[in-house]
Amino acid sequence: MQYVGIQTQQSRNNLRSGILLILFPCLVAVLTYLFCYLLITFTVEDDYGQYNTLAMTNQMFINLIPYIIGGVLVWFIIAYFTNSSIIKAATGARPLERKENKRIYNLVENLCMSQGMKMPKINIIDDDSLNAYASGINEQTYTITLSKGIIEKLNDEELEGVIAHELTHIRNHDVRLLIISIVFVGIFSMLAQIALRSVYYSSWTRSRNDKNNGAILILVLAMIVAAIGYFFATLMRFAISRKREYMADAGAAEMTKNPLALASALRKISADPDIEAVEREDVAQLFIQHPGKQAKSALSGLSGLFATHPPIEKRIAILEQF
């Protein structure tokens, strides 16, 4: 994969972030209209044909969309500004003090100084497996997190390559881009889960209250619409996640002038990337290699369309030819 300049990659990711911020409200609006149309179609007896159905749909959409957009906006603001603590809790990470490991601080500081970057925060996951990730949306929240295993089992050159990989994510602004996509997908996931659980509860109480039939239909329609949104938003998120790994590998090779060290690190990481605390798929894609069992099977079917990471063998091969 051809590597592009830092400024070009930053500009591209800033543009993509802007496009996501524009496309997401549009997707929400389209899905809201679809929900209104389906609801009118299945619940209202229309004696005046398609025109009246569309008129009623338009009126319901106009009445409903301000509340939908308002709720989504509140969710986005909360998730956007609390993402660091959410990710830390989801991965079991904690701050790594300088006195605990001066070696790591020296490696990070030297790389940051060579690139003119501000020093990020450093966290550690107390897990013997090998993995790492970058997170944050600005200089105040940028963080590099390393597992205990990756610190102990990689030599300095390999660890420098991994750190450079994560610093490239930060420098290229693709950490922020990915977090925005994660927040968006999370909204659809939450709506689908709420609708699914509500349908289950309503169907369970149906025998006691036949009036629940209409409510169940509404919830089923909401679940279908939310699932459609989740599907397309997830595809977009996965595509962003896969490409960013190639770019970060190339950036790390350029930063350290030692692509073979990162290739060696990836080989060791691929042998044991599983982080026990990580259960959420959206958080898993932040890591240098998928930290769960899907690391071995994510590429099966549809040519890896639903994979969060590209094949690590391909990444290693590219680095060896860099």
Swiss-Prot record:
Which Gene3D superfamilies does UniProt cross-reference here?
A: Metalloproteases ('zincins'), catalytic domain
Q: By its UniProt entry, which InterPro entries does this protein fall under? A: HtpX_protease, Pept_M48_protease_HtpX, Peptidase_M48
Record EC number: 3.4.24.-
Does Signal count among this protein's keywords? no
Q: Can the keyword Repeat be found in this entry's annotation?
A: no
GO molecular function terms noted in the UniProt entry = metalloendopeptidase activity; zinc ion binding
Q: How is the cofactor bound?
A: Binds 1 zinc ion per subunit.
List of catalytic residues: E166
**Location(s) in or outside the cell:** Cell inner membrane
The superkingdom of the source organism is: Bacteria
What are its cofactors? Zn(2+)
Q: Its topology with respect to the membrane?
A: Multi-pass membrane protein
**Principal subcellular localization:** membrane
Q: Which GO terms describe its cellular component?
A: plasma membrane
Q: Which amino acids does the record list as binding Zn(2+)?
A: H165, H169, E245
Q: Which GO terms describe its biological process?
A: proteolysis
Q: Which UniProt keywords apply?
A: Cell inner membrane, Cell membrane, Hydrolase, Membrane, Metal-binding, Metalloprotease, Protease, Transmembrane, Transmembrane helix, Zinc
Identification of the protein by name: Protease HtpX homolog
Which family does the UniProt entry place this protein in? Answer: Belongs to the peptidase M48B family.
Give me the segments passing through the membrane: 19-39, 61-81, 175-195, 216-236
